[in-house]
């Protein structure tokens, strides 16, 4: 079998070649070299996607320019994740880059039935570890939700970091750990505080902006753990209740920030309850106390109403005397008076309901306008080519970091 390994990591290439001694192996440092120097009848391509989003472009270049029918084994790294949806080759399989060479070779030579297992997985910005690729929907639930404890959702694929944060918050909060944006959208609705690890830089920024578009999540309290090597523009993210902390500050510092934010959450809940109580009290005050009495009077007057009908019928069949006409006029006057009181009471109560409806309509219009404005801003950014600028800047930072690591 002819196998092409694309990687500039000599150690990785040598270890794979050692386990593929019985095959015809070709190597290249990047996509351009692979397209230029490698034969076109390659059977299998092992691509080292250490550069994350940049590697996605190189894989697509290989596919579109030369290798369309080959199987692609993509070695991804947790620090520089890739999104399978952005990778064109249909016949692909994702394997954790740190897996033993034997495991990589085994996955590479597997039959096609196993190859497409990862294609339906939504990895988003954070590609989980290999165990999570096999068990797509399993989430690591560290602690069950307990009554009276604020719920903290930790978003990170760094197991060491999540373990440290979980231990630091143990007993004080109900903690749950997730690794991808899809889980954040599902679990975040129930969380009071979301701790988001932005180690993936521009990809994390993109995901946070996506979360900010979800109305139910936008008002949540976010603690964004930033990294100096892969900075993000926090101000650009439309999350009103966000705070930032250096991810290297340590689990204790992160726990302190969580406790500080939890106090804010508690105060907001108390304030919200007080507002509801004031609102209910206001509604009660707007309803006149006389209404029950008036209703009772109406009930008491019911027999008199029947009497009026009887007398009216009597008058229609008999001669109408002045006394009968006077009695009828008094009864009708009482009925009109009671009706006017009832109408007035109902009008007052309906006024409060109308004010509530007006407030809800006003909020709805506000949300619609915000959505329209946000879409126009995003369209303007797209025309400027912000994504391209971010990608180029990320590429430069990654290349500098890789050069430092290889020295």
Swiss-Prot record:
This is Uncharacterized protein aq_1873. It comes from the Bacteria. The keyword Coiled coil applies. Residues 102-151, 251-314 form a coiled coil. Keywords: Coiled coil. It comes from Aquifex aeolicus (strain VF5).
């Amino acid at each position: 079998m002819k196998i092409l390994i694309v990687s500039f990591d000599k150690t990785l290439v040598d270890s794979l070649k050692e386990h593929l001694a019985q095959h015809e192996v070709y190597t290249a440092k990047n996509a351009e070299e692979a397209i230029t120097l490698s034969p076109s009848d390659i059977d299998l391509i092992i691509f080292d996607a250490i550069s994350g989003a940049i590697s996605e472009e190189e894989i697509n270049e290989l596919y579109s320019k030369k290798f369309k029918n080959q199987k692609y084994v993509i070695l991804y790294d947790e620090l520089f994740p890739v999104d399978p949806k952005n990778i064109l080759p249909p016949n692909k399989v994702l394997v954790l880059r740190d897996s033993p060479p034997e495991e990589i070779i085994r996955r590479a030579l597997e039959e096609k039935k196993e190859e497409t297992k990862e294609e339906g997985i939504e990895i988003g910005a954070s590609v989980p570890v290999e165990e999570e690729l096999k068990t797509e929907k399993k989430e690591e639930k560290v602690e069950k939700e307990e009554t009276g404890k604020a719920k903290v959702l930790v978003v990170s694929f760094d197991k060491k970091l999540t373990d440290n944060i979980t231990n630091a918050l143990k007993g004080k909060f109900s903690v749950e750990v997730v690794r991808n944006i899809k889980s954040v959208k599902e679990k975040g609705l129930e969380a009071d505080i979301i701790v988001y690890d932005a180690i993936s830089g521009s990809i994390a920024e993109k995901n946070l902006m996506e979360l900010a578009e979800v109305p139910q999540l936008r008002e949540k309290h976010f603690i964004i753990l930033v990294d100096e090597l892969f900075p993000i523009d926090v101000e650009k993210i439309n999350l009103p209740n966000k705070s930032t902390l250096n991810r290297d500050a340590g689990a204790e510092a992160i726990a302190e920030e969580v406790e500080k934010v939890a106090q804010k959450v508690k105060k907001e809940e108390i304030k919200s309850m007080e507002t509801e109580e004031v609102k209910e009290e206001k509604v009660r005050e707007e309803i006149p106390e006389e209404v029950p009495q008036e209703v009772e009077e109406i009930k008491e007057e019911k027999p008199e109403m029947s009497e009026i009908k009887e007398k009216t019928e009597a008058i229609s069949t008999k001669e109408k005397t002045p006394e009968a006409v006077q009695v009828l006029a008094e009864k009708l006057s009482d009925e009109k008076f009671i009706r006017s009181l009832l109408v007035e009471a109902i009008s007052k109560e309906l006024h409060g309901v109308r004010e509530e409806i007006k407030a809800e309509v006003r909020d709805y219009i506000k949300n619609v306008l915000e959505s329209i404005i946000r879409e126009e801003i995003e369209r303007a950014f797209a025309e400027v080519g912000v994504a391209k600028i971010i990608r180029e800047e990320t590429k430069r930072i990654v290349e500098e970091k890789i050069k430092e690591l290889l020295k």
